[in-house]
Every structure is written in C-alpha cells, then in structure tokens.
C-alpha cells in the first residue's frame, strides 16, 4: 500500500494502479 501515498487523492486512479500492481505482483500488497 505504499503506492497509495505517492498517488494523487483519486480513488479511481488508486484502484486502477492497485489493479495493475496486483496483477504482476499480488504479494506486494500483502
């Protein structure tokens, strides 16, 4: 969840980034 801090205050943008990051590295969020 470190990407959320660098991302802008946008839920849509955060969701998209999280989805993109969770695909290649699903264990990174944990």
UniProtKB/Swiss-Prot annotation:
What are the boundaries of the signal sequence?
1-22
> What keyword terms does UniProt attach to this protein?
Signal
Superkingdom in the source lineage:
Eukaryota
Is the keyword Signal in the record?
A: yes
- What is the name attached to this protein's record? Putative uncharacterized protein SPAC110.05
**Naturally occurring in which organism (per UniProt):** Schizosaccharomyces pombe (strain 972 / ATCC 24843)
């Amino acid at each position: 969840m470190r990407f959320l801090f660098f991302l802008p205050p946008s839920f849509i943008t955060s969701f998209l980034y999280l989805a993109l990051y969770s695909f290649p590295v699903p264990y990174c969020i944990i």
